[in-house]
Amino acid sequence: MADSSGQQGKGRRVQPQWSPPAGTQPCRLHLYNSLTRNKEVFIPQDGKKVTWYCCGPTVYDASHMGHARSYISFDILRRVLKDYFKFDVFYCMNITDIDDKIIKRARQNHLFEQYREKRPEAAQLLEDVQAALKPFSVKLNETTDPDKKQMLERIQHAVQLATEPLEKAVQSRLTGEEVNSCVEVLLEEAKDLLSDWLDSTLGCDVTDNSIFSKLPKFWEGDFHRDMEALNVLPPDVLTRVSEYVPEIVNFVQKIVDNGYGYVSNGSVYFDTAKFASSEKHSYGKLVPEAVGDQKALQEGEGDLSISADRLSEKRSPNDFALWKASKPGEPSWPCPWGKGRPGWHIECSAMAGTLLGASMDIHGGGFDLRFPHHDNELAQSEAYFENDCWVRYFLHTGHLTIAGCKMSKSLKNFITIKDALKKHSARQLRLAFLMHSWKDTLDYSSNTMESALQYEKFLNEFFLNVKDILRAPVDITGQFEKWGEEEAELNKNFYDKKTAIHKALCDNVDTRTVMEEMRALVSQCNLYMAARKAVRKRPNQALLENIALYLTHMLKIFGAVEEDSSLGFPVGGPGTSLSLEATVMPYLQVLSEFREGVRKIAREQKVPEILQLSDALRDNILPELGVRFEDHEGLPTVVKLVDRNTLLKEREEKRRVEEEKRKKKEEAARRKQEQEAAKLAKMKIPPSEMFLSETDKYSKFDENGLPTHDMEGKELSKGQAKKLKKLFEAQEKLYKEYLQMAQNGSFQ
Amino acid sequence: MADSSGQQGKGRRVQPQWSPPAGTQPCRLHLYNSLTRNKEVFIPQDGKKVTWYCCGPTVYDASHMGHARSYISFDILRRVLKDYFKFDVFYCMNITDIDDKIIKRARQNHLFEQYREKRPEAAQLLEDVQAALKPFSVKLNETTDPDKKQMLERIQHAVQLATEPLEKAVQSRLTGEEVNSCVEVLLEEAKDLLSDWLDSTLGCDVTDNSIFSKLPKFWEGDFHRDMEALNVLPPDVLTRVSEYVPEIVNFVQKIVDNGYGYVSNGSVYFDTAKFASSEKHSYGKLVPEAVGDQKALQEGEGDLSISADRLSEKRSPNDFALWKASKPGEPSWPCPWGKGRPGWHIECSAMAGTLLGASMDIHGGGFDLRFPHHDNELAQSEAYFENDCWVRYFLHTGHLTIAGCKMSKSLKNFITIKDALKKHSARQLRLAFLMHSWKDTLDYSSNTMESALQYEKFLNEFFLNVKDILRAPVDITGQFEKWGEEEAELNKNFYDKKTAIHKALCDNVDTRTVMEEMRALVSQCNLYMAARKAVRKRPNQALLENIALYLTHMLKIFGAVEEDSSLGFPVGGPGTSLSLEATVMPYLQVLSEFREGVRKIAREQKVPEILQLSDALRDNILPELGVRFEDHEGLPTVVKLVDRNTLLKEREEKRRVEEEKRKKKEEAARRKQEQEAAKLAKMKIPPSEMFLSETDKYSKFDENGLPTHDMEGKELSKGQAKKLKKLFEAQEKLYKEYLQMAQNGSFQ
């Protein structure tokens, strides 16, 4: 405040008192934490760093929409925390490439291929199928789960349908080919059945360990490609169980040393009672009500490890395997307790523990992994680190249903990611996910997708309109027109919407509300643009561009628009107009000129290999890049940038035509050769012998071999004799020619 | 904790207690606030919204490096607050297009063009120049400021230099053409002088108001183009004084109504004493020590408004004009007090007040605007809104010096932005700014720019190397190799650096420290890459790519790398993100492989012409397109897409070095030849003649030509004779060698 004297001479020397504004209570990010089943304020443990571990796929088959449900939602959460809230996220994911499902599937595929390669006789196959049906029927009767039962019945029915025709073919001794086709059909239908049976009988003799790594490596590559296609960011670090076995062994050993694990018959089990009774720990933090649920526990133990003897090794049925002794036919690794392999739950504890240490901020996974997998992970790690906070925030993505039903192979509603991407683009799928909450069930149906498509179209129209407005020619000062009330009001709405969107993202990343707020903002812009149009006035370019850039920016944060992920300084300086043609043509020109220079020298100096290399460049390599070189004698080669697919089709067509031409030429050459051979064969016959073999026409011949009497001994007429004489002379000429050729050796 | 009973039957029904982690005290953004001359914690008034007003340019001439100093630094601050700290920034800037400088410049240009179009006779021009020199000399004598005085003297001198030749041409009645050329030269040199004189005499008769809008509109366009070239983001809203006169009039009226302004002789002045004495207000918040500084105040009143009568209209010399009555020849707008135009300070208060209301978060401007401009803005607005917090945080960018000196037209070190961009790219300028604190003085010198160029090169080589590593063909699972200690350590450094960078940005957006931290991070990566190369192992692609993407992202936030600002959904579906690199590299790869194939055959079949063609492609043709081929014996050629200018400079450098080497080689060969010739010449002398020519040393010789007596006829001592004998024998040997060579003709 001014000094009381009010005297204003040379001015006070001191700046007045200042205090920061009160500001408003900033709304903070809350996340739904499965550890409390509540939305909790999110506080990272160390500044802005967020350590995050997500359970990756078990890689033994194509990834399906259930995977998409989890990995697209976690991708959205990760991007929002990283790019919107600016947390410094360190995101790790594992690949389960050692697992009973993998072992079983690899062994079955291996044994079935071996069986098929031996090309069993029809009868043998029929016998084996019958043998395989016995254990199958037992399993069918024991199955209670309706979905699974239905699936097994379907297999049984298909096998019967394929068996009958083969039996008939065998009984009616049909040809090899017809039997073989029935064999093929039965082999295909009974594949699962036979594989199971072969595995149960021959599984333990399998010693080729490579089959247990080839299968997962293939499906891991497939998984990455699917994720790329869905625009899911790769993890910051990826861990594979097969590469962390030593760390897992140490992890198990320490749990045993800490008194929470015990060795039994070559396997090691986790002592849940011991752990639960300790003051420092709690078992079953996520799903306490599931503790003791044997069915869930068994599923966690893996198909090859739920035999009765395994159960007997445990002190309590609630205990679970940390390390499993391997039976013959199962891959194994050395360890203090004999030869075996990791249990399922321990992998994640060991790998996440190695990378993220004693306490991570976020652990994510699918909803159905809560128990036993995640609860057991928590127990293992808290037993290892002797703490009670291995995971601070546990996030579970909701289920995915297909048109209301659970997705399962039996209901034939099993949709792979590749299938889904044939029907919709990655962006449309992602918009659908954004329009749902990440933690609730998402029904993947035509309705769901229809509303996503509508949304995409609504937004796209808006972007196109704004781009059109921005293209209107205006001088550089014209883009900044004075704001009237409408601009001020639209701008106010814009900032209010941004605040609302911020609030929604703070509320457990509620993207459904965000998408509605974005839709409302676009509607407000549409109203503004229409109002300006009505009074023949140009809408304010800078304001509309700002709003459109904000919406594009949010879509990029959500991964619905691909971010330009180029590295470092863009080459070519600012504003290099990146139309493909203008960009690429200079480089192609250089390639073409270099090729021509090289061909010229090669022709002059007779270096055919270089000419072939130049042709291969034109015909095989460049078409792959959508480039067509057209060589014209004596003229510079014409360079064309064409749509790649069209070009490849053209190449195929050219090859087909060339192939046909080649075949025709070959055909013609063959026929010519045959004619020559026939001609030669004809020339070879001495005229004197030419008629002798025609005993079906003539009965007597003169001394030159010319026929004199026909079959019935009747003397030939003058006309007939004259005609034969002519043939005789013609042959004489040919024969002379033949002798001539034989002389100058032209028959090499 | 587990329930005390330890009984683990069906499991407890309740999840254990959970509490959020303590987390660490997040470091918050502090900004240096000129209102306290301290770094203050930055708290926006309403959630994440940040209202921000920046004083834009007075548009009457080309923008210079002083402008760049302010607008690049504010662009960096704005981008960091918007894209890094994710504040919801609303950034307004004005264009001063009504101002005494504009009025004077427009009128002078107008009158001078009229004078020139009348094509004055030589004699008339000479007379007028003399007339104009009178007031000019008065002004020169009155000028105290050393810079200004030097500039006026320079003009005076130049005019004299141009006057003499014209006078002579007139006296010696030279041809029309010669006279005209002298007239043109004098007109050009005396332009400022004549314009001033014409304006002082004819200014008041100018009535064509359009000249007062054409000049600023032109230079506003020029300013926007310069900003675009510097990659400075356009403001969210731009206000022009000429479009806000009604709002300004109301603003002045309300200040008068509130009792802080008074009308005097058609102008309106701000009553600083009244304002300062009020309990609710303080005057001179930014620079209290400058209150009363008449010189500074006068500069704020504008060149046309500091006449003595204007001063007499003020109640106190500290008062300043809110509204100025317009004199003839000055543009004017209707208002309650007759015809006039806005004062300088009131524009910003009125425009910012209209858009941002009673209290904004940030006001920015150049350091030398603190007093009187910004202090008067504060007074006006707080008088209007009757509050004491019109601006919460006042940010001033530091000065710019040119190689240590103040930039000024008189010192001829006045560098326009266009000049600067001819010498360096916008990115290099921005890197230089980033490597300095935004609030301190920045010296624009070759040193400053050299360190920026070094920095750019250091980063660019890193990006190129990472891109080369990422191109190494690896199957899709290969990009995720298991982390060893080196990867874990590099990753730890990476996250520590990100934390350090966050801390530096919180500390008043200290980009200088950030750039050093980024440099250190690159060095750590280089060490890691070198270590992996040393043990013939591939570096971890995913980790290096992550780090490179982070650095690129930070450079984009700082505006040093252009952001892809396309709107909406990219055309052409996913993966067509048209980064030049991704687009062009496949074609370059094909060119490189074709070249390698051709070189291989050419070497095998000894076709040197093709090898020369391949070298020419690498050395002459591809650099033009910014492509660098690096051939490594026995390894595939490394393809690098580099900035074209850098590459051409490199090629020039390479040629210069090769040229130098060639010259050195030639030089050495020439010297060698000379030595050999000298040696040969020496060998040719028969020993008998070798001393004969040395008559300055010896007077008598024996029969073999050996000297016996010195110059004075004195016999040589034994020692001397012995020494000469030795020389004689050495020459004998050489001579024999020479005869030998002559015989076997080795002198072609």
UniProtKB/Swiss-Prot annotation, chains A, B:
Binding site for Zn(2+): C55, C348, H373, E377
Modified residues (N6-acetyllysine): K503
Keyword Cytoplasm: yes
EC number of the protein: 6.1.1.16
Cited InterPro entries: Cys-tRNA-ligase (IPR015803), Cys-tRNA/MSH_ligase (IPR024909), Rossmann-like_a/b/a_fold (IPR014729), tRNA-synt_1_cat_dom (IPR032678), tRNAsynth_Ia_anticodon-bd (IPR009080)
Annotated positions binding L-cysteine: G56, T96, H373
Cellular location(s): Cytoplasm
GO MF term set: ATP binding; cysteine-tRNA ligase activity; identical protein binding; metal ion binding; protein homodimerization activity; tRNA binding
Record protein name field: Cysteine--tRNA ligase, cytoplasmic
Organism: Homo sapiens
